[in-house]
Regions:
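C-terminal lobe helix-coil module of Hanks-type protein kinase domains
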Residues: 4-8, 13-23, 27, 31, ...
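Regulatory activation segment
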Residues: 63-75
Length: 181
């Protein structure tokens, strides 16, 4: 969306289609477990398709998910992983809600929810587990050189995020699964 400079309303319409697709998967007892922009395809006529269900899990699967120590290779994309995935805990539909929250945050603020210095996996894990992200309306104005904050269009977009959109994104990024929706 950023590459195509899609306006906020257009981004939100596409995101709602993503949410509908994820809701359909959840209604069929499927958790995607690796939702991220590269697994979301927008067709030329504007329809959204979810891709790569390779690590998806059936919720009624009697086989418990293996617990992975933090040092073991895991099958998910860390930047979009929920805290319970990082900890190697049980994955539920709320895991996908967290990943959707990261995608929404990026659509709203044009940045990831966590600002890291070194971008190491350990720093990402710590942020996912312990750092509370800024509101998207605040994050959209923060850059290292302040150039975006000086742009009238950026300030106008930030004002559109204050309130409901800020709250929805942060609710989806709650650290505890039972606090997300």
């Amino acid at each position: 969306c950023a590459a195509n400079t899609m306006l906020l309303d257009g981004r939100l319409k596409l995101f709602l289609q993503v949410c509908e697709a994820v809701s359909h998967a959840h209604a069929n007892l499927i958790v995607h477990r690796d939702l991220k922009p590269s697994n979301i395809l927008v067709t030329p006529n504007g329809d959204v398709r979810l891709l790569d269900f390779g690590i998806a899990k059936l919720l009624d699967d009697p086989e418990p998910a293996p617990v992975h120590p933090r040092t073991e290779v895991r099958a998910f994309t860390l930047h979009y992983a929920a805290p319970e995935q990082v900890r190697g805990e049980l994955v539920t539909t709320m895991t996908d809600v967290y990943s959707l929250g990261v995608v929404l945050y990026e659509l709203l603020a044009d940045t990831k929810p966590y600002r890291l210095r070194r971008q190491t996996d350990a720093e990402w894990e710590e942020a996912i587990l312990a750092v509370e992200p800024l509101k998207p309306s605040v994050a959209t104005l923060r850059t290292t050189d302040g150039s975006r904050a000086r742009c009238p269009e950026t300030r106008r977009n930030a004002r559109k995020l204050v309130g409901d959109l800020d709250n929805i994104a942060l609710k989806a990024l709650a650290k505890q699964p039972e606090q997300r929706y």
